[in-house]
Amino acid sequence: MKKETQTKGEVTRLAVEDAAISLFLEQGYHATSMRQIAKRAHLALGGIYNHFSSKDEIFEAIIIDQHPYKKILPLVLAVEGETAEAFFRDAFRIVIRELGQRPEFINLMFIELVEFKGKHGSIMLREIAPKVLPIFRKHVKKMKGLRVHNPALLMRSFFGMIISYFVTEMIISNSVLSPLMPKNSADAYIELFLKGILKEPA
């Protein structure tokens, strides 16, 4: 959303969300108060309650308003792989590239999992699933070579691969394992997702 198209209220909401993101990443969700968020956003404490009733509502708004999936989804929907393999390779590269440009959302994901037990994930899925699930249904019906025939399971495993890629990338980075990894670990990761670790019997 461009600044010139935003109302004053929308600009204020986004300022509150940006302030909250920075504080959540600096000191954690539970250690951050509404007063601190208001101060960081240059608002009076009463002013913040004109837009959000609670800190939880701010966190939920961040997930809905600012998550990179809003930019990623149209790019993935535009992928036209002739085969399932081509589609998943292209889609994975797009997601990794775009999420890699917003590392703060990977850290917010940890806050979501640890402090909220993933409850906001269901909110995000309400928006994502109706748009993404038809893609997986199409590939299950149309493309040969798939061993998984449940579209929801296929979508879950694809999302799981993306999350595990970023989690392990953070852990392995600058560790003793880092120099032992393939030069392009993302390509190696999608290869494992597509073909597994076992060779086909001769």
Task: Enumerate the predicted regions with their spans.
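C-terminal peripheral helix-coil segments that are non-catalytic and often amphipathic
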Residues: 2, 97, 101, 133-142, ...
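Helix-turn-helix
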Residues: 15, 19, 23-57, 61-62
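Short, charged helix-capping/linker segments at alpha-helix termini
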Residues: 30-31, 145-149
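Residues in soluble alpha-helical coiled-coils and helical-bundle/repeat scaffolds
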Residues: 39, 50-57, 61, 82, ...
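Amphipathic alpha-helical linker/stalk segments
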Residues: 62-91, 136
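Helical hydrophobic small-molecule/effector-binding pocket
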Residues: 64, 86-111, 159-166
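Amphipathic alpha-helical packing segments from all-alpha helical-bundle domains
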Residues: 70-71, 118-145, 152-153, 167, ...
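Short secondary-structure transition hinges
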Residues: 97-135, 178-180
